[in-house]
């Protein structure tokens, strides 16, 4: 069944300003859109029909969060588990999956897809919108670096800047390799735009890039919040143990060091204030898995560097205060646990995450 059917009219244009993923998938016949629909439809077809239909509707309402649920469910299946979606718990809550593995061991898994560094993400999305609009204006033989972009939040607000950029692009001479880069700046109602044209004589299409977005990373804070979430804890308490929290970690989200710090604690390198030489390294065990013995999760399954085109193999972080027999398919992942420090055990299996056959397109 095609839960995301092919559009009836051809439209290979890219996504437009503030268009949602679902809106784009509904109208676009671009090869990438076709590939995304194929991945989703194929993945949904692996689930029981009732659950697949329900998850499809959820994807239309909140694509990113429920895409992660789809990926986790499929990954459990790839690991050899038979899954029961949304089983009723002893306290009338429902966990995302109860998984029975090939060795007979049962585990429950709850998924969480947090939005990390949201303000920075909004800024980068706005920059991407402006870059797409300016790509339509050219030029082809110059690479345009955004040194500064305005605070435009709609196509109408950005249109005066586009008009000025077109005039600037039209004034550019034939590029000379290693020639001086022309610079353009214009102040409008939504702030200043600064562009630098870098000679690129062999270019065949418009190329815009930058600016760098700086921000204070809140990944550790958001990871801790996921473990403190009252509803998630309630779901875990009502589920068949051991219960694992699967966390979505996109490229712009937390890495393994963020998880180490959030769950176990922080390694501190003490240095002499004058010479800068190290005086010794200590470990501050202030992570939630160490300080909060009431956490009902047996561990966290971190899906690192996850996107629709691939991912790193998940890493299993174990709660040091819970001792359960683990399914062999989970225990064979790279695991980390706190003893007197962070103990890491390498994976004993080949990576399997890409057996999901993520989105592929030319």
Question: In which residue ranges do the predicted regions lie?
Answer:
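Charge-dense, extended regions
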Residues: 287-362
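Histidine/cysteine-enriched polar flanking segments
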Residues: 42-48, 102, 107, 340-347, ...
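Interdomain/boundary linker segments immediately adjacent to catalytic/signaling cores
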Residues: 1-66, 119-161
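Metal-dependent nuclease catalytic core centered on acidic motifs
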Residues: 28, 114-297
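Elongated alpha-helical scaffolds
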Residues: 64-73, 78, 107
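An acidic, charge-biased composition feature
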Residues: 1-11, 29, 120, 253, ...
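Short acidic loop-to-beta-strand element that houses the catalytic metal-binding Asp/Glu
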Residues: 76, 86, 91-111
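Nucleic acid-processing catalytic cores of prokaryotic defense/repair systems
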Residues: 56-57, 73-80, 240
């Amino acid at each position: 069944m095609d839960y995301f059917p092919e559009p009836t009219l051809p439209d290979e244009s890219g996504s437009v300003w503030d268009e949602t993923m679902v809106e784009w998938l509904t109208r676009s016949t671009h090869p990438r859109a076709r590939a995304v629909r194929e991945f989703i439809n194929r993945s949904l077809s692996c689930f029981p029909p009732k659950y697949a239909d329900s998850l499809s509707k959820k994807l239309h309402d909140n694509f990113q969060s429920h895409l992660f649920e789809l990926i986790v469910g499929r990954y459990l299946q790839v690991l050899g588990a038979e899954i029961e979606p949304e089983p009723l718990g002893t306290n009338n809550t429902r966990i995302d999956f109860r998984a029975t593995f090939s060795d007979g061991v049962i585990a429950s898994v709850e998924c969480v897809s947090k939005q990390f560094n949201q303000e920075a993400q909004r800024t980068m999305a706005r920059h991407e919108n402006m870059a797409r609009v300016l790509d339509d204006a050219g030029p082809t033989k110059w690479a345009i670096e955004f040194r500064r972009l305005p605070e435009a939040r709609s196509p109408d607000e950005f249109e005066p800047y586009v008009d000025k950029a077109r005039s600037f692009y039209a004034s550019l001479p034939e590029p000379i390799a290693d020639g001086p880069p022309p610079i353009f700046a214009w102040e409008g109602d939504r702030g200043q735009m600064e562009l630098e044209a870098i000679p690129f004589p062999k270019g065949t299409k418009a190329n815009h890039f930058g600016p760098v977005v700086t921000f204070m990373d809140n990944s550790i804070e958001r990871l801790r919040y996921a473990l403190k979430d009252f509803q998630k804890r309630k779901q875990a308490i009502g589920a068949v143990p051991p219960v694992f929290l699967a966390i979505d970690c996109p490229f712009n989200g937390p890495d393994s060091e963020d998880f180490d710090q959030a769950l176990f604690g922080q390694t501190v390198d003490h240095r002499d204030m004058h010479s800068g030489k190290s005086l010794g390294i200590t470990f501050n065990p202030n992570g939630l898995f160490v300080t909060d013995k009431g956490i009902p999760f047996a561990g966290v399954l971190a899906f690192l560097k996850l996107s629709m085109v691939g991912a790193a193999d998940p890493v299993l972080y174990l709660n040091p205060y819970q001792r359960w027999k683990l399914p062999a398919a989970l225990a064979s992942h790279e695991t980390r646990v706190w003893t007197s420090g962070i103990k890491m055990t390498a994976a004993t299996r080949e990576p399997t995450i890409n057996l999901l056959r993520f989105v592929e397109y030319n």
